[in-house]
Amino acid sequence: MAKLGLNVDHIATVRQARGGSEPDPVTAAAIGELAGAEGITIHLREDRRHIQDRDLEILRRTVQTKLNLEMAATDEMVGIACRIRPEQCTLVPEKRQELTTEGGLDVLGNLAGITRATSSLREAGIVVSLFVDPTVEQIRASKESGADAIEIHTGRYAEARSEKSRHHELAAIREAIRLGNELGLTVHAGHGLNYVNILPLTGLAGIEEFNIGHSIISRAMLVGLDRAVREMVTLIRRP
């Protein structure tokens, strides 16, 4: 049965908007775990626009399930990760001008650097996942890099405007899951998923984890974080 990894980046986004100490992503993570999330995801960006080093350090000590650190494959971030040692690191592409991660990692085009980062992280006892588009080339390159897992970028599926386009993207995700499992990679999925578009994905065998943030935090503003997390967990676990 798939698990929910709750991304608390947007809690930090609200905090940073005023430069204060509230709301605290550490508190949000604890509420999320109590509500059924089986992992906490944060993205420590190079520009520190939301999650701060302090958040990572405290969450490493307080998260009771699994801490998943999203990060760029840079020497600085690899060094931080090897020092903090979260249970998992997910390597993602990063551009300073983007509002959020816009696409999958180009593993094929940056194989040497990603392999080097993956090796360093795995030597530190960290599970390594690569955030990739659902293409054969990127998934095979992910296996070649030595990664333990892939997180399928579901953004195109989430943004599809027609039924035909949605079916096309869903088919690509289904094939990506099949290939990932065939290659021995653990398969996760995330980006743009909400309480409606996740339903077709929960019926696909082979996905072990959904990483979701924006839609849950958005709903939490209306119904509270505990309820928002529980509702998503119920959808993911439905028979």
UniProtKB/Swiss-Prot annotation:
Keywords: Cytoplasm, Pyridoxine biosynthesis, Transferase. GO terms for cellular component: cytosol. Pfam families: PdxJ. It is an enzyme of class 2 (transferase). The record marks E151 as: Transition state stabilizer. It comes from the Bacteria. GO terms for biological process: pyridoxine biosynthetic process. One of its GO terms (molecular function) is pyridoxine 5'-phosphate synthase activity. Belongs to the PNP synthase family. Homooctamer; tetramer of dimers. Catalyzes the complicated ring closure reaction between the two acyclic compounds 1-deoxy-D-xylulose-5-phosphate (DXP) and 3-amino-2-oxopropyl phosphate (1-amino-acetone-3-phosphate or AAP) to form pyridoxine 5'-phosphate (PNP) and inorganic phosphate. This is Pyridoxine 5'-phosphate synthase. The lineage of its organism: Bacteria, Pseudomonadati, Thermodesulfobacteriota, Desulfuromonadia, Geobacterales. The gene is pdxJ.
